[in-house]
Design a protein with these regions (language model features):
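Acidic, metal-coordinating catalytic segment for phosphate/diphosphate chemistry
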Residues: 2-23, 94
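Conserved Nudix-box catalytic region and its N-terminal flanking loop in Nudix hydrolases
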Residues: 31-69
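A structural signal for short, well-ordered beta-strand segments
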Residues: 24, 80, 104-106
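Active-site-adjacent beta-strand/loop module that shapes the phosphate/pyrophosphate-binding cleft
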Residues: 84-112
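NUDIX/MutT-family hydrolases
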Residues: 114-146
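A generic structural micro-feature
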Residues: 14-18, 45, 94-100, 119
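A short coil-to-beta-strand element that immediately follows conserved catalytic motifs
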Residues: 74-83
Length: 155
């Protein structure tokens, strides 16, 4: 299946409202888990694990579920660290995608990384090494904010 076909079949394409999503900057031993998208949107781009909030879920429940589905890891979401907006328009200027993403600072609790079909790669990286990767916009800022928040809570 091509990326264009994947996007055409995605109900989040050409939405009537923004799509709410969560992500997690998960830290273990000073490193953060970075994943690479294996399908559209943003195929091949490095980002944080996460996904859509389902009806009736709290944000915390959603991020725990999404991380477990994508990576098999158990996490403790600690606190929201801002928000991100991703709006993509087609050649005619129509909104093709609109995501509002709420990232959490999170602690690793347990498990070994096992990726689902949405991801092609995962790696625990030093936050200072993210600049060499092609990442989603603002990823380094989210990771820095999450690291600072977790460090402040340890004091």
């Amino acid at each position: 299946m091509t990326e264009a076909t994947e996007m055409k079949d995605d109900p989040r394409t050409y939405p009537t409202r923004p799509y709410l999503a969560v992500s997690a900057a998960i830290f273990r031993g000073g490193k953060v888990l970075i994943v690479r998208r294996g399908r559209a949107p943003a195929k091949g781009i490095y980002t944080l694990p996460g996904g859509g909030v389902e009806l009736g879920e709290t944000l915390e429940q959603a991020v725990i579920r999404e991380v477990r589905e994508e990576t098999s890891l158990d996490i403790e979401p600690v606190e929201l660290v801002g928000f991100r907006q991703a709006i993509a328009r087609d050649a005619a200027g129509r909104v093709e995608r609109h995501f509002v993403i709420l990232p959490f600072a999170a602690r690793y609790i347990g498990g070994e990384v096992s990726l689902n079909e949405e991801l092609s790669e995962a790696d625990w990286r030093n936050p200072s090494a993210l600049g060499a990767l092609k990442t989603t916009e603002g990823l380094a800022d989210v990771v820095a904010a999450a690291a600072a928040r977790l460090a402040a809570l340890r004091r």
